[in-house]
Amino acid sequence: MGHRLTKIYTRTGDTGDTGLGDGTRVSKDSQRVHALGEVDELNSTIGLLLAEELPAGVRAALACIQHELFDLGGEVCIPGHTSMSERQVSRLEALLDDYNRDLAPLKEFILPGGTRAASLAHLARTVCRRAERALVSLSRAEPVGTAARKYLNRLSDLLFVLGRVLNRAGGGSDVLWQRGKTIEKGKGGREK
């Protein structure tokens, strides 16, 4: 097993730099640290979703995904290290196909919302897209594994589908986008 922290604070980052997994020091605002932070925020957002009542299969999948995101973070934290594989990407694709099979085809865009769990899945999806963009930016400057980028792309798709699944499981439905909808006079204003 890797390095264990016996002390939470080290004071080594007080000057604005931090240590990567290979021991090199970089600025805390470097692209690599930024991408790592985005993946960490994604994992935390999925943890928030896991605090909700979820179907057992969704819970098991998300719990596994949290571990895989830690692996992905390890890959980002150690330049040149690869921990993500095409097998993990394929597994997400299989989950996507399985969950999407039972959903009605979409005729319109849907809004992020519905049940609390579905809304959190959509929030996780948007955080995942941000993490993916950060990883793509990093890959333009330094080598990044293609499986890691693909994984985040598929994960955001899965989180979208899970938002729909969770709305259905919670007795709700997709919130359909209504083109051109505006606030009507006398509705949606301040309550008196």
Where are the regions that the model predicts?
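Phosphate/pyrophosphate-binding loop motifs in nucleotide- or prenyl diphosphate-using proteins
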Residues: 1-192
